[in-house]
Regions:
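Structural signature of outer-membrane beta-barrel domains
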Residues: 4-8, 21, 33-39, 71, ...
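Repeated loop/turn-to-beta-strand initiation elements of outer-membrane beta-barrel proteins
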Residues: 9, 22-28, 70-74, 84, ...
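Surface-exposed loop/turn segments flanking beta-strands in extracellular/periplasmic regions
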Residues: 23-24, 88-104
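Outer-membrane beta-barrel transmembrane strands
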Residues: 47-86, 109, 128-137
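Outer-membrane beta-barrel architecture
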Residues: 25-29, 71-75, 112-116, 136-145, ...
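C-terminal outer-membrane beta-barrel translocator/porin domains of Gram-negative envelope proteins
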Residues: 27-37, 41-53, 105, 147-201
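Residues on the lipid-exposed face of transmembrane beta-strands in outer-membrane beta-barrel proteins
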Residues: 1-3, 14-20, 32, 62-66, ...
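Residues that define the transmembrane beta-barrel architecture of outer-membrane proteins
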Residues: 8-12, 54-60, 109-115, 161-165
Length: 201
């Protein structure tokens, strides 16, 4: 948690995690928080820190994950987020002056309810089976993930409506005395764009 004296506001995140079946790595987690989001995560450095690229978001989320067989996992997540513009939020004056046209974007506050389901698979995942738990060691193969997400309109004030499919490949590997490295390759797209806000792209 952190508190901003200039704007007298509190930001932060709170989460809880419960591993209810250690042998199948089955878990549930809950989270909530208030922080800043980016309108465009892929903006240039000059634009990504511009006031117009920020918005305020408050969220609650619930996630379930379990292993169906060795290396193959399924997961589901539900998240509700309210998004609003910065309004009269004050930045440090010296920070503001470093950017041109540094005015916050104005838009109506909105709610987003999004449900996601997905699977991931790591071939030949190595593990140790203890009497009461399974300990994953790793694999020399990458992890393949496929996730489907849908924004649900008309639920808990949500007006957004879109569908999205994402596929990714991720792998961590050792590089000797340099420690560990990692790469991720991802692709995806919208299956439906009935109602999107700019930060949903």
């Amino acid at each position: 948690l952190n508190y901003g004296f200039r704007n007298q506001d509190m930001k932060g995140n709170l989460s809880g995690y419960y591993l209810y079946n250690p042998k199948k790595l089955s878990s549930v987690s809950l989270g909530m928080g208030s922080d800043f989001g980016f309108v465009n995560n892929f903006a240039t450095f000059a634009d990504i820190l511009n006031r117009s690229n920020f918005f305020v978001q408050k969220y609650v989320t619930a996630t379930h994950r379990t292993e169906l067989f060795n290396g193959f996992y399924s997961g589901a997540n539900v998240r509700r987020t309210t998004r609003s513009d910065l309004g009269d939020f004050e930045f440090n004056p010296s920070f503001d002056s470093a950017f041109s046209n540094n005015n916050p974007q104005r838009f109506k506050s909105s709610a987003l309810v999004i449900a996601s389901v997905g699977i991931s698979y790591t071939p030949k995942q190595l593990y140790i089976q203890e009497p009461k738990e399974k300990i994953v060691i790793g694999s020399k193969f990458p992890t393949f993930q496929l996730y489907y997400s849908q924004a649900i309109a008309g639920v808990l004030g949500s007006k957004a409506s879109f569908k999205e499919l994402d596929f990714s490949i991720n792998q961590k590997f050792n590089v000797g005395i340099f420690g560990q490295s990692e790469y991720t390759v991802s692709l995806g797209g919208f299956l439906d764009t009935s109602k999107l806000q700019i930060m949903d792209y």
